[in-house]
Structures are given as structure tokens and as C-alpha cells.
Amino acid sequence: MMADREVVLTAQGLKKLEDELELLKTVRRKEIAERIKQAIAFGDISENSEYDEAKNEQAQVEDRINKLETMLRKAVIIDEEDINTDIVSIGSIVQVNDLEFDEIVEYTIVGSTEADPYELKISNESPVGRALLGTKVGDVVEVQIPDGVTKYEILKITR
């Protein structure tokens, strides 16, 4: 993650990060501390794979906690009420027609932290997200994708 970049989030994305942080700090830390305690009880920790595994997991959890805390400090929350439905922006829900396959798809444009292609939440920094930003209903955009170029017609913009 970039050191000085702001993290753009929707309210839903903010809640997801806060929930993950809470889980890591309350539940996961305790679980790992208990595993370390049990591994130490086995005796010599110099060749104790359970201890090594728990310590590695502890380091990963602490690293994730630090990253989440940094993201939350740098968070800029997109207020749903401020989302302009005349043009595509972060937080917009955009219905497009993929002109190559004549298929209608609905994307939500989010900051990179929230992106989840399986939920059709695409990053404003992705090729499709960048191409859609600033467009209006009726616009047709060309997007460079791994297989070449595809065209999308903007059908609807909501929030």
C-alpha cells in the first residue's frame, strides 16, 4: 500500500474494515496467544513446529492489524448522498451493455481497497473503472482488456 495515499471507501467498505480489525484484535489475537501458550507448554520451543506456526501467524495478524489501522487513518469516506448520478464516480452503480457480447452488466465503482470482482465491485484504478469514471448515460467507452479491446455503452447510473 502506498505510504501517503488516501484510502477511498464507501460506508459499507469502512464497516467491513472496522469489523475485520475488531475481529483480529479481540478474537484472533486471543486464539493465537492461547496456541503459543500451549506450544510453550510442550517444552523445548527450539524444535517446536506448533510454536513456530503460531508465532508466524501472530506476525501475519499483527501486520494485517497495522495495515488496517493505517488504511482507516487515511480513509476518505464517500457519502452516498454526494454521489452524482449524472456521471460515473466512485460509489456509482453503473449498468453497462458490453457491446462485444451484447450482455448487460452492473458494476459498482469503489476504491481499490474495496474492490471485489466476484461481487462486481471494481476499482476506480482498474482498466474498466478508469474508463467508466466521468462518463454519462449514452456514452460508449473502449476498454483495453487482456484479450484486446471491448466497448461498453453506459445505460444507467445510480447510487
From Swiss-Prot:
<dbReference type="InterPro" id="IPR023459">
    <property type="entry name" value="Tscrpt_elong_fac_GreA/B_fam"/>
</dbReference>
<dbReference type="GO" id="GO:0006354">
    <property type="term" value="P:DNA-templated transcription elongation"/>
</dbReference>
<dbReference type="InterPro" id="IPR028624">
    <property type="entry name" value="Tscrpt_elong_fac_GreA/B"/>
</dbReference>
<dbReference type="Pfam" id="PF03449">
    <property type="entry name" value="GreA_GreB_N"/>
</dbReference>
<dbReference type="GO" id="GO:0070063">
    <property type="term" value="F:RNA polymerase binding"/>
</dbReference>
<keyword id="KW-0804">Transcription</keyword>
<comment type="function">
    <text>Necessary for efficient RNA polymerase transcription elongation past template-encoded arresting sites. The arresting sites in DNA have the property of trapping a certain fraction of elongating RNA polymerases that pass through, resulting in locked ternary complexes. Cleavage of the nascent transcript by cleavage factors such as GreA or GreB allows the resumption of elongation from the new 3'terminus. GreA releases sequences of 2 to 3 nucleotides.</text>
</comment>
<feature type="coiled-coil region">
    <location>
        <begin position="5"/>
        <end position="77"/>
    </location>
</feature>
<dbReference type="InterPro" id="IPR036953">
    <property type="entry name" value="GreA/GreB_C_sf"/>
</dbReference>
<dbReference type="InterPro" id="IPR022691">
    <property type="entry name" value="Tscrpt_elong_fac_GreA/B_N"/>
</dbReference>
<dbReference type="InterPro" id="IPR001437">
    <property type="entry name" value="Tscrpt_elong_fac_GreA/B_C"/>
</dbReference>
<protein>
    <recommendedName>
        <fullName>Transcription elongation factor GreA</fullName>
    </recommendedName>
</protein>
<dbReference type="InterPro" id="IPR036805">
    <property type="entry name" value="Tscrpt_elong_fac_GreA/B_N_sf"/>
</dbReference>
<keyword id="KW-0175">Coiled coil</keyword>
<dbReference type="InterPro" id="IPR018151">
    <property type="entry name" value="TF_GreA/GreB_CS"/>
</dbReference>
<comment type="similarity">
    <text>Belongs to the GreA/GreB family.</text>
</comment>
<dbReference type="GO" id="GO:0003677">
    <property type="term" value="F:DNA binding"/>
</dbReference>
<keyword id="KW-0805">Transcription regulation</keyword>
<dbReference type="InterPro" id="IPR006359">
    <property type="entry name" value="Tscrpt_elong_fac_GreA"/>
</dbReference>
<dbReference type="Pfam" id="PF01272">
    <property type="entry name" value="GreA_GreB"/>
</dbReference>
<dbReference type="GO" id="GO:0032784">
    <property type="term" value="P:regulation of DNA-templated transcription elongation"/>
</dbReference>
<keyword id="KW-0238">DNA-binding</keyword>
